[in-house]
Amino acid sequence: RVNTSADILATWQNNLQDLCEKQALAIPALVASNPRNHVVSSAAQGLSLGAGKFTAWPGELGLAAARDEAMVYQFADYSRQEWLSIGLRKGYMYMADLATEPRWMRIEGTFGESAELAASVMKQIVLGFQGPKLNPSSIALTTKHFPGGGAVENGHDPHFEWGKRELFEGGKFENNLI
């Protein structure tokens, strides 16, 4: 979770893989990251990874607001190439949650409240990072937080005990399954 330059990350990755290759089973390490390719206002330690170090694209809400599938795919494909160049092979991203609770503190990490738009953006991101089929130049993704992390009671974060209750007002649970 450090916000360091791409060349330092690549050197670190190469050294790690060299160490793994020297072990009896020579099993490579898989290093994962949160998103690294967005414009952010603050490059806080452990957050906003890659700020100022990787190509900067709009954040999640900005990508969705553009309503341009080709541009979202291009973002993901270019980002994939940068990740591959330094040895990152897995991303803990993106949030498929719908922004249905306005008090939730993580709305900026979603693609908004429209299930159809969020699904369209997620599809292009998966295709851009992974391809239509996993292959040697794919970046594996873990989409989070299924289902409906954005529908938490009182806007609390579901990572904590007090945010474990999700409310789907008006029977909107099905909307999270698009």
Regions found by a protein language model. Give the residues of each.
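Glycoside hydrolase catalytic-domain context in secreted enzymes
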Residues: 1-178
